[in-house]
Amino acid sequence: MFGSFGVLIALMMFKNQHPLNAQLLFVWTLMEAYTVGVVCASYTAAGQGRIVVEALVLTASIFAVLTAYTFQSKRDWSFMEAGLMSSLWLLIFWGLFSWFVPSLAGGLYSLFGALVFSGFIIFDTWQITERFGYDDHILASITLYLDILNLFLYILQFLSRDRH
């Protein structure tokens, strides 16, 4: 996890230096895939493999619908930025606090996380089409990848809340 974060920082620093940026994106993607693979394998080993598939289908469906809506709407979604960033900080602090108080409304936390990253999918898709330049493909990949990945993990957490 910390290695992945380190590669992500390096990726952000060298986002415009080709081919290093593509190589770092490849390494970071492999590290994230391994991490998510371990999470999914642990659910499967616990007899909850069906939940992983349900979370995958829900994530893909939500992403497709929100992306289509964002492209179709032609709205300026910049007003969402402050609220999404505030919500992200709330999720971070809530997650840290829940380490000390584990029963702190886990279902509500995961549902809120899924809603926040659904909002990020709309905002970042709009940002890619309206704010990002032609050379920002690495940054665009990272933002949507993180949105989809986090949405999947929060949905997975929400679906498994009563099945532990």
Model-inferred region functions:
Residues 1-164:
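A hydrophobic alpha-helical transmembrane-helix feature that marks the membrane cores
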